[in-house]
């Protein structure tokens, strides 16, 4: 899948494919130490103040040491939890089971996601040295390219440039998986080509009028008129936040 490294303002400067660089492998980008990495899907809102909600896919690395403000996975009183490292008191002696390296939000309104991971072999599970409470949450072997890219010929990946969507926890340097084949709809999160520039916004229709909606009060909403050249370049199928780069 091609990678547009110049970013989408939240644009990249031109729709030309000249801005596409080499293809990107999400497994290589998001999983640095495969034998020490596990992936799970959040069953509830684990850390909403950091934008980690139910159904998010979370990638943890067991081989790296946590740094200040890293999000860590730990268990306490028989419960699996996430917390910022160093942000809470009373964590002395708590067993840390992994550092969050990436989080993935899938746009389930746009795509039917049929996720069938391969089972981990017993020896692979034992190498992770995890308690049962964590083991039972692991998805198994997953190919992030297959999970996140349903239509490879029509999909590209780009990086967010700016903070106009930070109210939805979509921030500067986050990755976007964008599918040009998906149909747009009221309320969709889309990469829009407006009057010669790209921008990332929600597309809302109110009384027959189209609006491009930011998620930051510092940015105005944009009313689309007949004189505007607006094209929906693609629908955001997933947003990837790299907690460790």
Locate each region found by the language model:
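Structural motif
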Residues: 55-56, 70, 173-174, 188
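Surface loops and adjacent helix of pleckstrin homology
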Residues: 63, 85-86, 170, 181, ...
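A general secondary-structure boundary signal
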Residues: 187, 209-214
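Short acidic low-complexity segments
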Residues: 60-66, 178-184
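Hydrophobic beta-strand signal
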Residues: 59, 73, 177-178, 191
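Short, positionally conserved secondary-structure boundary motifs
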Residues: 1-48, 53-54, 64-68, 75-166, ...
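Structured core of small recognition/catalytic domains
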Residues: 160, 166, 171-179
């Amino acid at each position: 899948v091609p990678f547009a490294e110049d970013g989408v303002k939240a644009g990249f400067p031109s729709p030309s494919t000249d801005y596409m660089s080499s293809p990107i492998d999400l497994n290589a980008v998001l999983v640095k130490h495969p034998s020490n990495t596990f992936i799970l899907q959040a069953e509830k809102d684990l850390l909403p103040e950091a934008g980690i909600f139910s159904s998010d896919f979370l990638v943890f690395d067991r081989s790296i040491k946590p740094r200040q403000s890293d999000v860590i996975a730990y268990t306490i009183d028989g419960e699996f939890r996430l917390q910022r490292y160093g942000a809470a008191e009373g964590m002395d002696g708590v067993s840390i089971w992994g550092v969050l390296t990436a989080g993935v939000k899938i746009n389930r309104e746009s795509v039917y996601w049929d996720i069938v991971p391969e089972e981990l072999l017993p020896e692979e599970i034992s190498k992770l040295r995890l308690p049962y409470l964590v083991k039972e949450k692991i998805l198994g072997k997953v190919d992030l390219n297959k999970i996140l890219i349903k239509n490879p010929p029509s999909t590209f990946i780009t990086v967010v440039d700016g903070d106009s969507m930070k109210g939805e926890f979509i921030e500067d340097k986050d990755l976007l998986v964008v599918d040009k084949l998906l149909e747009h709809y009221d309320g969709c999160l889309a990469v829009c080509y407006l009057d010669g520039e790209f921008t990332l916004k929600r597309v809302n229709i109110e009384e027959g009028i189209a609006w491009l909606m930011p998620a930051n009060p510092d940015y105005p909403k944009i009313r689309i008129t007949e004189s505007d050249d607006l094209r929906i370049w693609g629908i955001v199928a997933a947003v990837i936040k790299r907690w460790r780069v």
